Curated annotation (Swiss-Prot):
Receptor for the neuromedin-U and neuromedin-S neuropeptides. It is a multi-pass membrane protein. Glycans are attached at N27, N41. Keywords: Cell membrane, Disulfide bond, G-protein coupled receptor, Glycoprotein, Membrane, Receptor, Transducer, Transmembrane, Transmembrane helix. It comes from Mus musculus. This is Neuromedin-U receptor 1. The keyword Transmembrane helix applies.
Length: 428
C-alpha cells in the first residue's frame, strides 16, 4: 500500500504565500478531480485563479450599471406601491393585499439580493460575512423568490374568481381570507426554501496533500449534488412550470369571458328599439371595449413578463447542476452567458411587477399623486344607472379594478366614465 500524504497539515502555514510546495512527499493517488499533482507547485494566488476564477467578474462594470438602474426603478416602484396601500384606507382591498405582499417580496429581493450579488461580483472570494450570513442570504433570497411567484399566482386566481365567478368572489375574496392566504404564502415559501438552504454553506478550496488555501472561502453548495439536482428540478416544476401554466390558463379564461360578454352586449343592443337607446348603448360598448382591450393587453404582458423573467433563473440553476464536473470551455462560456442573463431578468422582474400590477392603473397612480397633494380625486362616478344591465356584465365590470372604495354592500354598483377605472367589490 502506498503511504499516505506525510504531515500535510504543515504546508499551509509553513510556506510564504508566493512559495511553491514540493510534491515529493505526497502520494499521487490522493488527487481526485478536479485537482492535479502539479497543483502542489502553484502558489495560493495561482490556485485561487485556477479553481475560483478572477476575484472580480470581467463584466462587473456594465452589469453594475444595469443593476443600479434596475435597483432605482424597482425600489421606487415597489416603494410607491407600499406607500399608496399603507397611507390610504380605500386602497386596502383584498386584491391590494396581494399587491402589497408582492411589493414587499420584490423590495427584499432588490434591497438584499442585488447588493449581495454585486458584492460577490466585485469580490468573488473570500466571503467575509461568515457562515451565518451565508445561510441567512440563501434562506432569505429563496424565500422571497418563492413568495413572489406564489403572490403572482394567487393574484391571478383572485382575478379569475372575480371576473369569471363574481358571485363566489363576494363570499370568498374577503380581507380576512386574503390575509390568511398571504400568511400561508410566506409560510410555504419559507418551508420550501429550507432544502436548498441546507445544501449551502461556506466552502474553502482544499488541495490534497496541501490543505486549505487561504482567502478562498465562498458561500456555495456544500451538500450532495444529486440532492441539489432534485431540489432545483422540483422547484422549477412547482414554482415555474406549474404557475406559468396556471396563470396562462386563467388569463385565457378571463379573456374569453370578456369577449363573450361583449358579444352578449352587442346582441342586447341590437334588440333595443329606440335610436337614442341604441346610441347610448353603442357609446357604452366603445368605452367597455377600450377597457377590455387594456385589460387583455395587460394580462398578456403579465404572462410574457413572468415567463421571460423567471425562465433564465431556473435554467441557470438547472444548467449549473448538470454541467458541474463535466464542464468544457464551450459549456463554461454558455453557462456564463445564461448566468448573466438570469441575474438581469431576475431582478428586472422585481422592478417590472409594480409597473404591471400597480402603476399601470390610472386610479393607483392618481391616488398616489393625491396622497402627495399633486392630484385630484380620480374616477368621478356618475349616478347609478338603473337600466336593464346584464347582471354578469355589471359584476364583471365591478371586479376588474385594482383599487377599492367603501364597502360594496353600502354603495350600489356605478357606471364609471373611465373604463379603466371600474370599481372593485370589496366584501369584508
Amino acid at each position: 500500500m502506498t503511504p499516505p500524504c506525510l504531515n500535510c497539515s504543515i504546508f499551509p502555514g509553513a510556506l510564504s504565500p508566493n512559495a511553491s510546495r514540493s510534491p515529493l512527499v505526497c502520494n499521487i493517488s490522493e488527487f481526485k478531480w478536479p485537482y492535479q499533482p502539479e497543483d502542489l507547485n502553484l502558489t495560493d494566488e495561482a490556485l485561487r485563479l485556477k479553481y475560483l476564477g478572477p476575484q472580480q467578474m470581467k463584466q462587473f462594470v456594465p452589469i453594475c450599471v444595469t443593476y443600479l438602474l434596475i435597483f432605482v426603478v424597482g425600489t421606487l416602484g415597489n416603494g410607491l406601491t407600499c406607500t399608496v396601500i399603507l397611507r390610504n384606507k380605500t386602497m386596502r382591498t383584498p386584491t391590494n393585499f396581494y399587491l402589497f405582499s408582492l411589493a414587499v417580496s420584490d423590495m427584499l429581493v432588490l434591497l438584499v439580493g442585488l447588493p449581495l450579488e454585486l458584492y460577490e461580483m466585485q469580490q468573488n472570494y473570500p466571503f467575509q460575512l461568515g457562515a451565518s450570513a451565508c445561510y441567512f442570504r440563501i434562506l432569505l433570497l429563496e424565500t422571497v423568490c418563492l413568495a413572489s411567484v406564489l403572490n403572482v399566482t394567487a393574484l391571478s386566481v383572485e382575478r379569475y374568481v372575480a371576473v369569471v365567478r363574481p358571485l363566489q368572489a363576494k363570499s370568498v375574496m374577503t380581507r380576512a381570507h386574503v390575509r390568511r392566504m398571504v400568511g400561508a404564502i410566506w409560510v410555504l415559501a419559507t418551508l420550501f426554501s429550507l432544502p436548498n438552504t441546507s445544501l449551502h454553506g461556506l466552502s474553502q478550496l482544499t488541495v490534497p496533500c496541501r490543505g486549505p488555501v487561504p482567502d478562498s472561502a465562498i458561500c456555495s453548495l456544500v451538500g450532495p449534488m444529486d440532492f441539489y439536482k432534485l431540489v432545483v428540478l422540483t422547484t422549477a416544476l412547482l414554482f415555474f412550470c406549474l404557475p406559468m401554466v396556471t396563470i396562462s390558463v386563467l388569463y385565457l379564461l378571463i379573456g374569453l369571458r370578456l369577449r363573450r360578454e361583449r358579444m352578449l352586449l352587442q346582441v342586447e343592443v341590437k334588440g333595443r328599439k329606440t335610436a337614442a337607446t341604441q346610441e347610448t348603448s353603442h357609446r357604452r360598448i366603445q368605452l367597455q371595449d377600450r377597457g377590455r382591450r387594456q385589460v387583455t393587453k395587460m394580462l398578456f404582458a403579465l404572462v410574457v413578463v413572468f415567463g421571460i423573467c423567471w425562465a433564465p433563473f431556473h435554467a441557470d440553476r438547472i444548467m449549473w447542476s448538470l454541467v458541474y464536473g463535466h464542464s468544457t470551455e464551450g459549456l463554461h462560456l454558455a453557462y456564463q452567458c445564461v448566468h448573466i442573463a438570469s441575474g438581469i431578468f431576475f431582478y428586472l422582474g422585481s422592478a417590472a411587477n409594480p409597473v404591471l400590477y400597480s402603476l399601470m392603473s390610472t386610479r393607483f397612480r392618481e391616488t398616489f399623486l393625491q396622497a402627495l397633494g399633486l392630484g385630484t380625486q380620480c374616477c368621478h362616478r356618475r349616478q347609478p344607472y338603473h337600466g336593464s344591465h346584464n347582471h354578469i356584465r355589471l359584476t364583471t365590470g365591478s371586479t376588474l379594478c385594482d383599487v377599492g372604495h367603501r364597502n360594496s354592500r353600502d354603495e350600489p354598483l356605478a357606471v364609471n366614465e373611465d373604463p379603466g377605472c371600474q370599481q372593485e367589490t370589496d366584501p369584508s
